[in-house]
Every structure is written in structure tokens, then in C-alpha cells.
Amino acid sequence: MNRQSSEKLKKTCAWFIHLIASMCGTGLLGLFVTNVTLYRQIKICGNREGMSGWVQINNNCYTMVENITFDELIGHCTKHDSIIPNALDQSEVLIVSSVLGVKDHWMPFTKKSRNWFHGKLPVNIKGDGDKREELGKPRKPDKSEKCTIYYDNGIIEENCNKKHTGICFSPFF
């Protein structure tokens, strides 16, 4: 190979290296822009304020909190911009309970002046005596039982100061 051929080969190789480097740079810039654009569109349940374990179910986000009283659960959910799930939708309760693997958990029903409410909405709660006995409770609820838990496809009256599993809910964003 003569000297001119060797110089031409060097220039061609240098040109190819510059071409590849510029293509890689352009490609990486394109990936970065795409990633930033998609990140703004992706809706994440994610970790909120240090609270991990959020799960997306039917376009909503849920997380489980173990060993908590009813009042503690309300405060905990509020702190994380969430609420106790709407228990008026039984299909929601069944899906969330099975996905999170929760057997019993707090429901958002409370007793005031001998009537049951979901917030300010009156609801009809009839606890299941058989399920109460399964939990070692008397068939009839005690007057101090002013909260409810969901247990084995039923609702049971419970003392608000007892500790159970709780579930927090937040819309998917």
C-alpha cells in the first residue's frame, strides 16, 4: 500500500469514527428526550412520603398498614393523602383484599347514636354472629364496638381501639 492510499484510509476511518460518535450522541439525546416526555405521562402509585408498598388495582392505588387502630389508620391515610377504601362497593373490597392478601381489615363504618354511618351517609350494618364466633367474640356485639372490620366476606362490629390491618386508598395519579 502506498502513502496516498494509507492517508486516504486514515481519513476515511476518522470520518467513520466521527459519524458513529455523532450518531450515538444523537441517539442518546433522543432517548433522553423520549424518557423525560414519557415520565411526565406515566402515572405512578409509587412511594409517598416514605411509605412504600402501593399497588395499582383498577386505576386506583392501595397500600396495607398492619397492626393499627381505626383512629390511627385515619390519621395514617390522611398523612399520605389517602382514605380508607369505599366499602360500599363489595367488588372493590374483594379484589383489594385478595390482591393484598388481607383476611381482616378496617372498614370505614362507624356507629353514632345507635346508627351506622359511612362518613355522614347512613348505612345498614348487620354483623355476622357466626363470623364473630370464629374470631372468639360473642354472637351479639358489645355496645363499645363502634367500628367495623371486614372478615371472610362479612362485616363484624369491632372496638375502635383494637389493632387490625388497615388499607389506604388513593386515586391513580
Curated annotation (Swiss-Prot):
Gene3D superfamilies: Mannose-Binding Protein A, subunit A. It comes from the Viruses. GO terms for molecular function: carbohydrate binding. SUPFAM superfamilies: C-type lectin-like. Signal peptide: none annotated. InterPro entries: C-type_lectin-like/link_sf (IPR016186), CTDL_fold (IPR016187). This is Putative C-type lectin protein FPV198.
